[in-house]
């Protein structure tokens, strides 16, 4: 089933092609199972689609699985709680070394409530694949109108992170772009944007990170360390908890 916007914002059309026959059959079966008139179910589905399109949308660029959760997991939890639609792109899952990382990332994304996709770029070789990464971001920018994009800070010293952020700056020129901190990769960073968080957001962030059993050996996965960072950022904002960001670009009209 392919949705198409009509001439007016409130008008939606759908077309059925051979490729989507199974979707249409599923749609009819759903109506039958619920003893519901197809036209009523279609009306409800259209209404749901319109409401979803009205949601503010955030995209999180995660060079490796776990970067998104480490850098802005609490903020993701808060945005979703407030009705935002959040999508994350994991660019590398290191499948050759840790095949289970894919499942870990999927479970983490589900806990936070965000949609996700997992790509298969080779870790440490993002500079070589820069053009392919640029194209992926370009395609996303054409497909969705994001209000907010998260990416590693511009001073992140990891080469993979640097490529993702550089290409994000090229592509996402019409929306707010914030750089999330990963302290072990940031020797010099200016955090000038802080998002206040509640304890429940931090709990969800840590629960999501606990899915990454393969990564728990790293010092930055220590629960006390994770809590100390959000507490420190909270002190800077005079609030119990916060996550800090580098303001790369702000477009206020899309955030209000």
Name each region found by the language model.
Residues 63, 153-154, 181-183:
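Histidine-centered beta-alpha loop that forms part of the nucleotide-sugar donor binding/catalytic region
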Residues 68, 95-97, 124, 156-161, ...:
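Active-site environment of divalent metal-dependent phosphoester hydrolases
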Residues 72, 99-101, 162, 188-193:
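Short aromatic-enriched loop/helix-cap "lid" or pocket-rim segments at secondary-structure transitions
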Residues 160, 164, 168-171, 175-178:
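Conserved beta-sheet core of the metallophosphoesterase superfamily
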Residues 114, 137-155, 161, 165:
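Proline-aspartate-enriched helix->loop->beta-strand connector
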Residues 2-3, 8-26, 108-114, 143-144, ...:
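The feature marks non-catalytic terminal segments
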Residues 2-144, 170-174, 229, 247:
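Active-site rim/loop-helix segments in enzyme catalytic domains that contact anionic ligands
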Residues 87-90, 150, 179-181:
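Short beta-strand segments
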């Amino acid at each position: 089933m392919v949705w198409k916007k009509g001439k007016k914002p409130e008008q939606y059309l759908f077309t059925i092609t051979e490729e989507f026959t199974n979707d249409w059959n599923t749609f009819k079966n759903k109506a039958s199972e619920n003893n519901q008139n197809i036209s009523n179910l279609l009306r409800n589905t259209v209404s749901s689609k319109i409401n979803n399109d009205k949601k503010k949308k955030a995209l999180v660029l995660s060079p490796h699985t776990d970067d998104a959760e480490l850098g802005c997991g609490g903020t993701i939890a808060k945005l979703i709680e407030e009705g935002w639609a959040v999508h994350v792109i994991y660019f590398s899952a290191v499948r050759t070394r840790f095949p289970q990382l894919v499942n870990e990332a999927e479970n983490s994304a589900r806990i936070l409530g965000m949609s996700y996709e997992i790509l298969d770029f080779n870790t440490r070789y993002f500079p070589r694949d820069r053009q392919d990464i640029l194209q992926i971001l370009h395609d996303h920018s054409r497909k969705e109108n994001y209000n907010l994009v998260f990416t590693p800070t511009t001073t992140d010293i990891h080469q993979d992170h640097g490529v993702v952020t550089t290409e994000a700056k090229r592509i996402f020129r019409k929306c707010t772009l914030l750089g999330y901190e990963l302290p072990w990769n940031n020797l010099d960073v200016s955090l000038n944007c802080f998002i206040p968080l509640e304890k429940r957001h931090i709990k969800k962030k840590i629960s999501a990170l606990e899915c990454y059993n393969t990564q728990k050996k790293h010092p930055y996965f220590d629960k006390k360390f994770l809590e100390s960072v959000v507490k420190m950022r909270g002190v800077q904002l005079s609030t119990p908890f916060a996550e800090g960001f580098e303001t790369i670009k702000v477009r206020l009209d899309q955030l209000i």
